[in-house]
Amino acid sequence: MIVFTRRITEADTVTGTLTLAVDSRIKSRLRVTLDDGREAGLMLERGHLLRGGELLADADGRQVVRVLAAPEAVSTVRCADPHLLARAAYHLGNRHVPLQIEPGLLRYQHDHVLDDMVRGLGLNVDAERAPFEPESGAYQSAPHGHGHDHPFVRLPAHS
């Protein structure tokens, strides 16, 4: 079985594709079937969402696959009014909903209760099948910096 262990940024040859829904693209350890039917495994660094278009390689770099975001059941909100779109993003984010944000568009995994809430804000919602590429903040668990250092200071225990 092929085991993909690392992300790469470019490859001379891509030997296959791997189409996954977002619920699988958040996992770092996973048994998968490539689009050509070959069995494979993912043993990747934890805490990173796989994006459509990313390349994965096995240990020696002979096998390289391109990840594709599978079409899945999503709710899509399209709106030319940035204020209305921002209000919807605020309310969805307040519910910790993984959210894809693009100019004039919000997308989340289909949920009729959330659809009703967004419609209540005055927006139209389309239920459709489309690739879902949420903001990584909902899944990112790796440490991150802010461009400056913070020394660790132990606070005194409460008495």
Swiss-Prot record:
State the family named in the UniProt similarity comment for this chain: Belongs to the UreE family.
Residues of the signal sequence? none
Which gene name belongs to this protein? ureE
Q: Where in the cell is it found?
A: Cytoplasm
Q: What is this protein called?
A: Urease accessory protein UreE
Annotated TM spans = none
Function of the protein: Involved in urease metallocenter assembly. Binds nickel. Probably functions as a nickel donor during metallocenter assembly.
Q: Which Gene3D superfamilies match?
A: Urease metallochaperone UreE, N-terminal domain, UreE, C-terminal domain
GO cellular component, alphabetical, reads: cytoplasm
Q: Which UniProt keywords apply?
A: Chaperone, Cytoplasm, Nickel, Nickel insertion
Keyword Cytoplasm in annotation: yes
GO molecular function of the protein, one example? nickel cation binding
Q: Give the superkingdom in one word.
A: Bacteria
Chief subcellular site? cytoplasm
GO BP annotation list? protein folding; protein-containing complex assembly; urea metabolic process
